[in-house]
Amino acid sequence: GNDGISFAHAVSAPDADFTKEQLWRALASKVDVDGKLVENPYKKWSDIDASLPNKKIEILIAPPTSGTRDAWNSLVMGKGCTKTAKSLYDAAGKKAKKECAKMREDGYAVEAGENDTLIVQKLTSNPDAYGFFGYSYLVANKDKVKAASIEGVQPSLEGIQNYSYPIARPLFFYVKKAHIGVVPGIQEYLKEFTSKKSMGNRGYLAKIGLVPLASDKYKVTRTAALDLNTINIK
């Protein structure tokens, strides 16, 4: 299946739209300014771009152990990091991918744990703050929080399925072929997990937050599960 990461704020806050580079500049430990890497100087969104709100940057972030944080690092911090910053890291003999993902620790980005309910409560009480979490949690709390657009696109079921939403990711299910016929029930479990009643559009996994695969990709996945073929869904 798939998941999308929402960059959310209180429903009472004005609508917002950010690019990946703007989000990277808001969160990164170091950014490029005038061709040099410096400690992040941005205190307000408008410091990054005059078109953004004249409000203090306040972002609740997931901890480094979180899968959501890992996906955010890849899809936002990695993609939003500028070519200039990457070149400067490379020239310094540092791994750009790792350095670009480092987040600031000066109070503008605050770790909020992995309790999404607590994050929603904090966003509701502070309309100027933002936080990121899975799309399903956004839907479940749509009366309290809403998503900012990312590069002009709002998170949606279809947008996550076809990856037109910029912060969408595939979710993988791994089975070791050597265990088939050795570990009791594993093949039956694989068949159940990939059945329509499980991961289909109206399956029980969709009801608890999974964004189902598009029909063509579901057919490929289901066939591979039944035939025990290795596939790579993109």
Which residues does each PLM region occupy?
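Flexible loop/hinge segments at secondary-structure junctions
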Residues: 1-234
